[in-house]
Swiss-Prot record:
It catalyses: [protein]-peptidylproline (omega=180) = [protein]-peptidylproline (omega=0). One of its GO terms (molecular function) is peptidyl-prolyl cis-trans isomerase activity. The keyword Oxidoreductase does not apply. Its EC number is 5.2.1.8. GO terms for biological process: protein folding. PPIases accelerate the folding of proteins. It catalyzes the cis-trans isomerization of proline imidic peptide bonds in oligopeptides. It comes from the Eukaryota. Keywords: Isomerase, Rotamase. GO terms for cellular component: cytoplasm. PANTHER family: PEPTIDYL-PROLYL CIS-TRANS ISOMERASE, PEPTIDYL-PROLYL CIS-TRANS ISOMERASE D-RELATED. Residues 7-170 form the PPIase cyclophilin-type domain. This is Peptidyl-prolyl cis-trans isomerase 7. The gene is cyn-7. The lineage of its organism: Eukaryota, Metazoa, Ecdysozoa, Nematoda, Chromadorea. InterPro entries: Cyclophilin-like_dom_sf, Cyclophilin-type_PPIase, Cyclophilin-type_PPIase_CS, Cyclophilin-type_PPIase_dom. It comes from Caenorhabditis elegans.
């Protein structure tokens, strides 16, 4: 079984910046990987929130240099929303994969078993998140674009410029 690859085309302050390509661990965390894949394609239509179940047009709302870039809140855009393809939240699948370094793709949450659509891409090793956040993929191309997004962050997490997922899908 080959692992699916998905992409984000990023704009920063309205300017096209480049593409991030991610490989999803559907063999390790199939439910988590499928949620993210379908949110990249938008194939599931409209969610319970009334908003499309799609990352396209959403932004990285929390960017902390030397830590991570976080996005996936396509319902509210500020970190308080988001929705999975399974309904609002779904359980932690497993913690087999670890936060080993830059490019690790992991689920953001509000405690155990609260996965929705919010995710983060690590920019450094974040071992303290092991066993708390489900790792479900990694960046295979465009780590330099992740760094450009990271460069628009702040210690508070508030972005200096709008970092947008202008387009996304499956390769």
């Amino acid at each position: 079984m080959s692992r699916p690859r998905v992409f984000f085309d990023i704009t920063i302050a309205g300017k096209p910046t480049g593409r991030i390509v991610m490989e999803l661990y559907n063999d390790i965390v199939p439910k988590t990987a499928e949620n993210f894949r379908a949110l990249c394609t938008g194939e599931k239509g409209v969610g319970k929130s009334g908003k499309p179940l799609h990352f396209k047009g959403s932004k990285f709302h929390r960017i902390i240099p030397e830590f991570m870039i976080q996005g996936g809140d396509f319902t509210r855009g500020n970190g308080t929303g988001g929705e999975s393809i399974y309904g609002e939240k779904f359980p932690d699948e497993n913690f087999k994969e670890k936060h080993t370094g830059p490019g690790v793709l992991s689920m953001a949450n509000a405690g155990p078993n609260t996965n929705g659509s919010q995710f983060f891409l690590c920019t450094v090793k974040t071992a303290w998140l092991d066993g708390k956040h489900v790792v479900f993929g990694r960046v295979v191309e465009g780590l330099d674009i992740v760094s450009k997004v990271e460069g628009n962050g702040s210690s508070s997490g508030t972005p200096k410029s709008e970092c947008l997922i202008a387009d996304c899908g499956q390769l």
